[in-house]
């Protein structure tokens, strides 16, 4: 995924045009970012994913290879590379629209077989930027391999019991946590009351 980020003092209202202060194109996707950082920290990282046959896809593969992320299991199905349109205001608050293209072309059975075939595997990390079926199969394989499983539930949607029961670490941000708990804000929230059940 590629991040297309515009910085502005004020987020435009519907029908309004405002001037931006800066525009940045960068590598994105929570899974890809975690893979890159892990590789830079010395971990042996394999990325299983899908990018387009466009210039964004070329750049992502080059970036993986440059930092030591193994990209041999990245497929290129002919779709456009997925993008995230990000707007950041003067307070650093962001608003993100994810347009999934190639990401959604991953085959869940292939993902399962790949995870089962990788030697010396210790962790499986994924998020909601791929399909629910891929997450199910990835975590199923991960637990069969006695791996730690980590789920980043963004963009947020309810989490089926089949996924939640195979998740060791759930790492939502503030907004996603509020959605899970059906609350509007963390102000005065008692975290001892947090409940994580299927279909949150």
Locate predicted features.
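Ribokinase/PfkB-type carbohydrate-kinase core domain
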Residues: 1, 63-79, 86-200
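Glycine-rich phosphate/adenosyl-contacting loop at the front of the ribokinase-like
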Residues: 1-50, 55-66
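Residue-level marker for the onset of beta-strands and adjacent loop->beta junctions
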Residues: 34, 81-84
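Short, basic and Ser/Thr-rich N-terminal targeting/leader segments
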Residues: 41, 79-82
């Amino acid at each position: 995924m590629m991040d297309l980020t515009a910085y502005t003092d004020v987020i435009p209202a519907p029908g309004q045009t405002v001037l931006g202060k800066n525009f940045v194109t960068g590598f994105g996707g929570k899974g890809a970012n975690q893979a890159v950082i892990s590789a830079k920290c010395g971990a042996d990282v394999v990325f299983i994913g899908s990018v387009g046959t466009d210039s964004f896809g070329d750049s992502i593969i080059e970036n993986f290879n440059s930092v030591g992320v193994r990209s041999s299991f990245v497929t290129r199905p002919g779709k456009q590379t997925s993008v995230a349109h990000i707007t950041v205001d003067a307070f650093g608050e962001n608003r993100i629209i994810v347009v999934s293209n190639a990401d959604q072309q991953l085959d869940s059975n292939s993902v399962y077989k790949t995870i089962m075939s990788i030697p010396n595997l210790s962790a499986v990390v994924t998020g909601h930027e791929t399909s629910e079926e891929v997450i199910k199969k990835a975590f199923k394989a991960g637990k069969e391999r006695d791996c730690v499983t980590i789920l980043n539930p963004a963009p947020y949607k309810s989490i089926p019991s089949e996924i939640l029961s195979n998740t060791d670490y759930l790492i939502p941000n503030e907004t996603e946590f509020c959605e899970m708990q059906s609350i509007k804000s963390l102000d005065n929230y008692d975290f001892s009351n947090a409940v994580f059940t299927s279909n949150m």
